[in-house]
Amino acid sequence: FKNRVVFPFEGNYEQFRHVIHHELVHAMINDMVYGGRMQNIVSSRAKIRVPIWSNEGLAEYLSSNWDPKADMTMRDIAVHERMPSVKELNYFMAYKGGQSIWRFITGKYGREKIADIFRSMKRTQNDQKGYERALGMNYEDLTKQWHKYLKKEYWPDVKDRDPLEDMSEKLTDHKKARNFYNVSPALSPDGSMVALLTDQNGYFDIHILDAMTGKRIKKLIKGNRSVDFEELKWLQPGLSWSPDNKKIVVAAKAGKSDVLHVIDVKTKKSKKYELELDGVFSAAWSPNGNDIAFVGQSGSSSDIYIYDIEKEAARKITDDVFSDSYPTWNSEGNQIAFVSDRGDYVQGEFQGSMYEHDYSQTDIYTINILDGIINRVTNTEYNESHPVWANTQEKLFYTADYNGVWNLFMHPLVNYNSETGEEETIQQYPITNVLTGLQQPTLSRDDNTLIFAGYSGIGWDLYSLSNPLSLNKKNVAPTQFILNQDVNTEDISDLRRHKSSPDLASYEYGSYSNWVFAKGYENYNLPLEDSNDNEVLIPPDSLKNDGEYIPRSYKTKFTLDIVSGNLQLSNVFGASGMTYFSFSDILGDHQIAFGTEMVLTLENSDYFFQYGYLKNKLDYYFTAFQNANFFQVDYVSLVRLRHYGIQTMISQPFSRFQRLDYGFSWHNINYTKLVTTYNNFGQLEYKADTTYTYSTILPSVSWVFDNSVFGMTGPIDGFRQNTSLTISPGYGSNNLKFQTIKSDIRKYWRLGKDYTIAVRGYIGKSIGKDKQKFFLGGVPYLIAGGGETNGVDDNGNFREIILDDDNESLIHDIYFTEYAWPLRGARFGERFGNTAALLNFEVRFPFINYLALGFPLKMIFGNIRGHAFM
């Protein structure tokens, strides 16, 4: 609502820089197209919807420009797949495909065309018309031009490169499984099994496969469904086996913090080791069986730690500001290889600032865990990652984006050749030359099998290599991306800096092409006499004497988030509506909302006010409300039901999946019968004839659990439940006493990608002197029909039991009843009582995937869902 951006930091500075730049591009687009406010979308003042490929693609392009991973994705598309149209770019391809389109556009027209396109989209309030006006091409023409560009760019790269399936044995098939990720392989020491992270069921789970055939042995862990495995670290993965092949260690988010899980492969039992760190990633089990190396993030850095299982204690073995990742042990268990952006800073304290350090390039390092000495293994201009130590020879395998493709490298660690008896120069070399790219190699103890994750066919799969130590050096030719870098540099740059201090003397008379005509940008058009381009751009009261920015205390300031309205019609309360306003501060610590209809006097209007204090783990809410409803009871009389009170609630989360809500509410219901009379002037007016009031306090507590996954039309997998207890202790004018417990339980089973079975059970019970009624039957907003009510014939078109004139418990039935629905085939309130139970069963399925009509009109229908229920 406020165009706010929250940045996660997990100890990796390059990742942090990328996220900041990426999200700020979104903020810029939201500000430029939508005025920086969700309200403009809600109120339809901004009718345009920026395509996801245009939005995410630009954020990726401006934050990363172009890199080997993006190049890998598009090379795979150009070679292996049907190239999608721009309208078909969604999901993962919205990011990389959109990034490629922006690279094509800026390469052909210049970066200035980015602003032209978004200005045109905003003027026309149509995304395709915006592109057409700025580029002279509609989406169909843009697709054709982009496809030609992809062919010219990537078809030359095919020559002399090996498709993954030709140079290795494929163990998984993401197309058959209809998933995207099969990553983070961990080969058991004996080479018989491989563990991996996979998203086959829409979650990230850990599976165990046969390392020879790829056949699944078992699903070891279900991720994203429980508190202990709330999140498996798939962005920085790391699975590792114990030396005896019996257990696996994995880092995961469990509730409030990250932990190490040690899982017995046979029994699936898990032991959790809690660590006082902000983040835990990439665990690796030592050959001695007692130590586990992992990446720990604390504050502003990530370091390598070792956890002693026997002592249940962790110690830090690197301690600096640099980003360290992917630790791996040597066969003796006395050295660890890891990835770092430290450059030449291997010993001693780093005295500089990280923003002056090149943290975008990574190399391989080793550290002796006994003396803490760090040695640099690689020193190239390329990025190296995912080291794995050979067990039978002094060699190291790792991946590198050498010449634009992520390949597997071998690096000898000693310069003595046992065959010749001579010393040789240590030289790393590629042992694969793949077409797309590979990552995350893992070795068996005898070094006879190496398994890695490779990208091909718009997805990741596991591949196996035999006898990797015997593989010869490969020649990896540079890609077109690398070759063209020398001529057309694609580095990230500050595109505004040249505009901050233009040399006016160099301008031709009357040329204002580089001027910025906008309020607040006057200084961009003035020459600066000194070399510090930024001095005049910084407000003088923002800096200290040493040049650092002055920290300022945060001040709470409320601004409007959204204004909306609603109109609804009920057979009980008639027509009603309300205008809703919501305010919050920039940090989201405080929230104020109120709504009103204000069509009559204060006494006869609907309104509410709510304040939420959301700064800490516990959320506090305070609400005051009033609803006034009028009913025509006969030709000369109206009934006014006025319901007003206050409510307080505390929401206490225990994890991502469950919370406890508790509080109390104070209710006052005023019943007034208004009779039509004539005043002294002969005018009609209403006069109160009968008045009585209900007043009660209702403490309540609810336990909520929800790990469901939503699809396009609702939950498709998981479990949801809400169990609540409400008590009326008898305080108030009517001494209303009851205790009600109810539970709503829902379970969803996902069958493949398209089918879901849903079961829902509802049960409720009320006891006490004034026990509540449960109304059973009907569905919300569909309440017509004849038949019987509680066994009594009732041929009326509508069931209005709670408004029957002879109903002695009128107010109690309206304001203190519970509804058990949906019960299709029955009318609203067809059964009522103090105990209720309801069971629903549904099968959800794709009804029409695609239907094109030619007569009487050319129309296309698609993605229409259906369900069968009982």
Label every model-predicted segment.
Residues N629, Y635-V636, F681-M870:
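C-terminal outer-membrane beta-barrel translocator/porin domains of Gram-negative envelope proteins
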Residues K2-K69, R75, A115:
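Zinc-dependent metallopeptidase catalytic helix centered on the HExxH motif
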Residues P185-M193, L239-K247, A283-D291, P327-Q335, ...:
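Blade-terminus and WD-like Trp-Asp/Gly-His loop motifs, strongest in beta-propeller folds
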Residues N475, Q480-K617, D689-P715, D813-R824, ...:
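Outer-membrane beta-barrel initiation region
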Residues I29, V50-A70, R75-E140:
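Active-site-proximal alpha-helical
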Residues M72, D76, R178-F180, L197-H207, ...:
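A flexible loop/linker signature enriched in serine peptidases of the S9 family
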Residues Q347, L435, Q439, G459, ...:
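Outer-membrane beta-barrel translocator/channel fold
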Residues L89, R119, R123-E230, W234-L239, ...:
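Beta/coil-rich, acidic/histidine-enriched accessory regions frequently appended to metallopeptidases
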